Regions:
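Cytochrome P450 catalytic-core helices
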Residues: 22-47, 157-166
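Conserved cytochrome P450 catalytic core segment spanning the I/J/K helices
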Residues: 1-27, 41, 60, 65, ...
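Amphipathic, well-packed alpha-helical segments that form the structural scaffold of globular domains
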Residues: 9, 13, 28, 45, ...
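Conserved cytochrome P450 K-helix/beta-meander segment immediately N-terminal to the heme-binding cysteine loop
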Residues: 91-95, 109-137
């Protein structure tokens, strides 16, 4: 069906507010981590200088900036920008270890907890962009999810990564 004018306005507000606030938070934490880790900042700066020189970046430059992108992903791992927004309702009883989550229960997924799991991220509090470089070992699908996961994943995730990288 079609959205009413009020529904359309509400959806526009959600898209706008969800996008700028979370990207701003991610960049704020990224800047703090770069300032606290000058050797990592130097690697990102050198990569940007080598690829761009003095020119303005464009979308074609994204694949040429893997360390910069990895540093942003690592910042979102340590400080997920939407840490409390991931909720789901159990559509059936779920057995998790010795626990049973009854159908209809609200389940909160905590990206911060997942992102600090030492099984997937040794030294989880350390800022190590190398974890996200193209040659790094692959992560399990649910180990890193700053944009959510599955059918309700953030529709703006690719735009957000492009915007933050450029």
């Amino acid at each position: 069906g079609r959205l009413s004018e009020a529904e359309l306005r509400a959806q526009c507000k959600v898209i706008f507010l969800a996008g700028f606030d979370t990207s701003a938070k991610a960049l704020q934490w990224w800047a703090w981590l770069m300032a606290a880790n000058p050797e990592k900042a130097g690697l990102a700066f050198d990569e940007v200088r080598q690829v761009l020189g003095d020119r303005t970046p464009c979308a074609d430059d994204l694949p040429k900036l893997p360390y910069l992108a990895a540093s942003l992903k690592e910042a979102m791992r340590i400080y997920p920008p939407a840490a409390g927004l991931l909720t789901r309702r159990a559509t059936a009883d779920i057995k998790a270890g010795s626990w049973v989550i009854p159908k209809g229960s609200l389940v909160v997924v905590a990206p911060w907890v997942l992102h600090h799991d030492a099984r997937h991220f040794p030294q989880p509090d350390a800022f190590r962009p190398e974890r996200f470089m193209p040659d790094a070992p692959p992560l399990p699908r649910s180990a890193w999810m700053p944009f959510g996961l599955g059918p309700r994943v953030c529709i703006g995730q690719h735009f957000a990564m492009t915007e933050m990288t450029l």
